[in-house]
């Protein structure tokens, strides 16, 4: 079988010319720099785009890597928060190896941020607060989904949803599932990427040696 190559894929490219990233303009604290870029990403954002969508990469003890899109749900106490099913593939991999990578790409700004760090579960109280702020259908969906497990059919899943709706009618509180909640990523490195002409992009990386340290070292990387 021949390789699948869509027409002209090798010629698909954009010229990046919206701006630059210089050390003199970058914040000394990468969290402040992230906040600045995130706020700019919210400006003139296309209505189809979720600027808090990020790629979460995890790995198991054998070194196999899995990546997927999750939603950033907050930055609190200098940690990046997201929520998911603890029994999912990512949940089991993070139990085995708490080192993770996050990547946010904002094409309308021609920018990307990579974050590497370690992950811990948030408190059940924090998970409950967020869970009950979600739309009711999303709360029910968290109960129905046995994430990453094989299921017989979509119909079986929808039947389970109907049963849960009958069990928890409007006006009753839906409990937080035991296997669902939040994670907090403590960053150890950031890389801020700004697209530039001629593929000579700007890349500034911040690193620290200790999770309790506020002493970040900034360096420029070759594109």
Curated annotation (Swiss-Prot):
Highest taxon, organism lineage: Bacteria
Enzyme class: oxidoreductase
Gene Ontology annotations of biological process type: pyridoxine biosynthetic process
UniProt GO molecular function: FMN binding; pyridoxamine phosphate oxidase activity
Signal peptide as annotated in the record: none
Residues forming coiled coils: none
EC number: 1.4.3.5
Keywords of this entry: Flavoprotein, FMN, Oxidoreductase, Pyridoxine biosynthesis
Pathway in which the depicted protein is active: Cofactor metabolism; pyridoxal 5'-phosphate salvage; pyridoxal 5'-phosphate from pyridoxamine 5'-phosphate: step 1/1; Cofactor metabolism; pyridoxal 5'-phosphate salvage; pyridoxal 5'-phosphate from pyridoxine 5'-phosphate: step 1/1
Cofactor annotation remark: Binds 1 FMN per subunit.
Catalytic activity, reaction form: pyridoxamine 5'-phosphate + O2 + H2O = pyridoxal 5'-phosphate + H2O2 + NH4(+); pyridoxine 5'-phosphate + O2 = pyridoxal 5'-phosphate + H2O2
Names of required cofactors: FMN
Residues the record lists as binding FMN: 68-73, 83-84, 90, 112, 147-148, 193, 203
Binding site for substrate: 13-16, 73, 130, 134, 138, 199-201
One of the Pfam families matching this protein, by short name: PNPOx_N
Disulfide bridge partners, by residue number: none
Assembly mode: Homodimer.
Family assignment from sequence similarity: Belongs to the pyridoxamine 5'-phosphate oxidase family.
Task performed by this protein: Catalyzes the oxidation of either pyridoxine 5'-phosphate (PNP) or pyridoxamine 5'-phosphate (PMP) into pyridoxal 5'-phosphate (PLP).
Name the UniProt record assigns to this protein: Pyridoxine/pyridoxamine 5'-phosphate oxidase
Source organism of the structure: Rhodopirellula baltica (strain DSM 10527 / NCIMB 13988 / SH1)
